[in-house]
Amino acid sequence: MEDKNKTIKETLQGSADAGKRKKLIIKKKGDDPSTPSPAASPKKETVAESAPSSKPPVMPLPLPGDSGQSPIVRPAPSSHSPAKREESPGKQDAGRPPRDKDTRQGGGSSYPPSRSPFQKEDSNIIVSRPIQRTGPSRPNSGGGYQGNRGPGQGGGGYQGNRGPGQGGGGYQGNRGPGPGQGGGGYQGNRGPGQGGGGYQGNRGPRSGGTGTRPMPITSAEVELSQSRGSSVTSKKKGHDKEKSTSDRDFSGAENTKFFKQKFKKTKVVGVSGVSVPKEITLLENVQVGELAKKMNLKPGDVIGKLMKMGMMVTINNIIDAETAALLADEYGCKVKVVSLYEETIIEEEKDNQEDYINRPPVVTIMGHVDHGKTKLLDTIRRSSVIDTESGGITQHIGAYQVRTARGLITFLDTPGHEAFTSMRARGAKVTDIVVLVVAADDGVMPQTLEAISHAKAAEVPILVAINKIDLPAANPEKIMQELANHGLQSEEWGGETMYAKISARENIGIDKLLEMILLQAEVMDLKANPKRRAKGTIIEAKLDPGRGSVATVLIQNGTLRVGDPFVAGVFSGRVRAMYNDLGQLIQEAGPAFPAQVTGIDGVPDAGAPFDAMADEKEARNISQHRIEFERIGNAGAATGTSSKVTLENMNEFIKQGALKELKVIIKADVRGSAEAIKESLEKLSTPEVKLNVIQSGAGAIVDMDVMLASASNALIIGFHVRANPKTIALAEKEGVQIKYYNIIYQVVDEIKLAMEGLLEPEKIEEVIGTAEIREIFKVSKIGNIAGCMVLSGKIQKSANIRVIGDGVTKFEGKLKSLKRVKDDVNDVVAGFECGIQVDGYNDFKVGDTIEAYNVTVIKRKLE
């Protein structure tokens, strides 16, 4: 009640007697009744008919709290009642009776919202506005809704229910049976009476409105409204401004057309309404699910598209970038392909050669089981390492650094040679010198020979330590003789191998052995740069219950400090703490220093590369790329391991310069057969391709043979022997080829054919004709054509040609066209003129010679 002097009028429906009406005038307390209200001139009154005496067929919808009152009558709000917020009738659901709302200052009942189409003059496309009339209300023009109708003249019905008055209104063209006054229709059907009320804005020609519906004033406006499908504005005296008279409808044809234009989709929409990006970045291979995620699409949509392209895939299948680009192109998305392998490579830091200094040698102790390897290391370190080992046999790789009178030496204690080979198979080369321990009382054992083979395959110098010379059965001379038969000739006997006779238990000859190691290191001139970021190799890694992932790292170059971010294999981390081989905390580790490092987010493999990084974020990115690279099946390349050689791909390795010799491992049923095959194959070596038998022996093909072949990039030949399923599975995993034979000459013939394919074929050149350039014709868009006279032989279009001028070969290539006059020909013989166009060459000169020749390729044979 904003205006204190304003009169609130409420239209109330009365009884069936149309002549009896009650006027309800409510004024605020304190107003002078004799003084006219300034807000109403002439005075406005709201006339309502009294409630009908009988209930209508359809039950009214009373509001809560109105019990005991007429369902149509609404009491005027009191002065202390809070003002109700006006709600848009356009927001109400179509087909459902709207709730009564207070739409005018005086309060009153609201009627159903108009169903008329949009009014074009109205700037608001959502909210409908009820008509506010300034003139007196019309008593003879009530319109009902769902059975609620007035009893007076011209009541309008809905759904076939007609009021008892004169001229009841029907539904959808059905007109009331009254005598003609006030029949109301539906959807454009108007009653002929006075003041009929319709539905959706279509009303009879009499001036009278129902509820909040606008109403055309003249018949011309009615026709215009009907033809346009929209309501019109009403102009009244005293009003210069046009008012909107239409509520908004969301189901009309015009509205549908409007919304299609207004909200037309212009983008391809993916999951959750997110648009497909214009460009994405992919690796060479990508999972279907990952592609869908990058394109904001559902995986099912991507799979469906690929099926239409003829590919049966699942969400976990991997497709190449070319296929992904074709699919993305259908969505208007461009694909940028990046190399995943390049993302896994750490850019090498530039070194200053002046910063390089001598570094300690890294020594690996190898030999047969129980020949005294760990005891020797224990004696050197003067500590009790053996007591911590299970049963006195080494169970893990240990790395230790000892200080001697002449300098530091780093020792690797391996369980036999398996770990040594495993690290080499992963591309790691950590050892500078191998110390081969042989028991003086036991002699050369099979594992000793395998250790020799591994060391030679790694191209690492070997020092021999003949242990247990204090025992009565010791025979060092016999050991030296046996080893000389396997290529380890002693310096005392004119060879190049240094021998040391020692007793690890009695500490005999240890100093001489250490002196030999340092002497060999001086010859090798081992250097490193301690001023750069650390670079090394994982020696071993484990999961410690108290410290998490712990890795033993051999620093090969640079210096590692606490807090440095790093990448270890496919994992990343930051150095949380470092320990030396005695378990003491240290702050930094220099070249050739073995350190235990904590702070890794995983357990890397032995032999994995270790690189300190400048930025932790970069370390994580490289780690993620390596994990992705490993996931899609390229783990070998991610850790630096190259592809393995087979008899079928040897030629490719030769062309790439990656293979200069063919390495073979021979296993036979008896040692005599193995030696015979070895001698036969070694005779196939040529200056271009050498055949190297790195190991031969009797017995079945075992896991160690596979690991040696993997580390050496060699083939395995089995003669009358087989590998068990476990070994076969390991060979497949490592990419090692195993060939089986039963006849010796089959072995020799197949290897011979493979090596002949590696030989560079012999090429024989035959000149078939020459021609002299007499004239040059310049043709636009084609190039220069040489007018020639064939002097000897013939010029063939398919032949190779060379252009010779002043005795110098100017160009070699192929003919692009050969013509006689204007005709294309295949050859031109001596004595005839011809036109020659050379592919990729236009610098012809008169007097130059064009020579045609053929090349014959002859396959070479091994002699």
Curated annotation (Swiss-Prot):
Spans traversing the lipid bilayer: none
Keyword Repeat: no
Sequence positions that bind GTP: 367-374, 413-417, 467-470
Region: G1, residue numbers: 367-374
Region annotation G3: where it falls in the sequence: 413-416
Record's keyword terms, sorted: Cytoplasm, GTP-binding, Initiation factor, Nucleotide-binding, Protein biosynthesis
Region forming the signal peptide: none
Region of interest (Disordered), residue spans: 1-251
Keyword Nucleus tagged: no
Spans annotated as G4: 467-470
Polar residues: compositionally biased ranges: 224-233
Region described as G2: 392-396
GO biological process: translational initiation
Biased amino acid composition, Pro residues: 54-63
Record-annotated tr-type G domain positions: 358-527
Major location category of this protein: cytoplasm
Subcellular location: Cytoplasm
Pfam assignment, any one: IF-2
G5 as annotated region, ranges: 503-505
Gene Ontology CC terms: cytoplasm; cytosol
UniProt family annotation: Belongs to the TRAFAC class translation factor GTPase superfamily. Classic translation factor GTPase family. IF-2 subfamily.
Summary of the function given for this chain in its UniProt record: One of the essential components for the initiation of protein synthesis. Protects formylmethionyl-tRNA from spontaneous hydrolysis and promotes its binding to the 30S ribosomal subunits. Also involved in the hydrolysis of GTP during the formation of the 70S ribosomal complex.
Name assigned to this protein: Translation initiation factor IF-2
Organism (species): Leptospira interrogans serogroup Icterohaemorrhagiae serovar Lai (strain 56601)
Gene: infB
